[in-house]
Amino acid sequence: MTDAIDPDLIERGRKMFAGDWHFIWASPSIETLPPMGSVEIAFAGRSNVGKSSLINALTGRNALARTSHTPGRTQELIFFEGPPNAGLRLVDMPGYGYAAASKAKVASWTSLIHHFLQGRATLARVYVLIDGRHGLKDVDLDILKTLDKAAVSYQIVLTKADQVKAAELAERVTATVAALAKHPAAFPEVLTTSSRTGAGMPELRAAMIRLLDERR
């Protein structure tokens, strides 16, 4: 699923995410975005795919990002910042694909996300979270097209890997990699994670360290 990652990147990722991570900003509209500064890495995905749980698992803080059992509850861009020497912000994006949301609300979220993606020079990558039990859906493919148009680098992360048999997960990774061949802005490697067991978190942290190194 992933090639062997440099142990130094794994260790640097562990140290950075063991530091003090905290909430800094919530933006319900493009006009209320925080000033650009640190490198930003955003997390997108369908409602209840596990974005908040993944951010909590990454940082080792159970309550940093609020999790909700109500799909579509996160309606803002939520910014978190790490230790001063990290130079990194994490952005929890509004969940998409919640059928019960009103058309006006969906339009508002869509506008916010599109403007954020197209006008944020500090945005290094978007991790698009896909439920590992189900794989890519049409609504996910729509988001990938949006990212392609915005020329924003993105990578797929299959979540809830602990709830899928190993052989089935491997097949899902292969199918996802094949689908990404049609998307020019997609990073060709697919990551798998479990917020419950911590599987895949060291590799995801290491990938972020590598991104930071590339931006410096």
UniProtKB/Swiss-Prot annotation:
Domain of life of the native organism: Bacteria
Gene Ontology annotations of biological process type: division septum assembly
Coiled coil: none
Residues binding Mg(2+): S52, T74
Gene Ontology cellular component terms for the protein in this record: cytosol
List of residues binding GTP: 45-52, 72-76, 92-95, 159-162, 193-195
Gene3D superfamilies (UniProt xref): P-loop containing nucleotide triphosphate hydrolases (3.40.50.300)
Keyword terms, alphabetized: Cell cycle, Cell division, GTP-binding, Magnesium, Metal-binding, Nucleotide-binding, Septation
Cofactor entry: Mg(2+)
Classification via InterPro entries: G_ENGB_dom (IPR030393), GTP-bd (IPR006073), GTP-bd_ribosome_bio_YsxC (IPR019987), P-loop_NTPase (IPR027417)
First and last residue of the signal peptide: none
Domain EngB-type G: 37-214
One Gene Ontology term of the molecular function aspect: GTP binding
Keyword Nucleus: no
The protein's role, per its UniProt record: Necessary for normal cell division and for the maintenance of normal septation.
NCBIfam families: GTPase_YsxC (TIGR03598)
PANTHER family the record matches: ENGB-TYPE G DOMAIN-CONTAINING PROTEIN (PTHR11649:SF13), MSS1/TRME-RELATED GTP-BINDING PROTEIN (PTHR11649)
Homology family: Belongs to the TRAFAC class TrmE-Era-EngA-EngB-Septin-like GTPase superfamily. EngB GTPase family.
Name of this protein: Probable GTP-binding protein EngB
Organism: Rhodopseudomonas palustris (strain ATCC BAA-98 / CGA009)
High-level lineage: Bacteria, Pseudomonadati, Pseudomonadota, Alphaproteobacteria, Hyphomicrobiales
Gene, per the UniProt record: engB
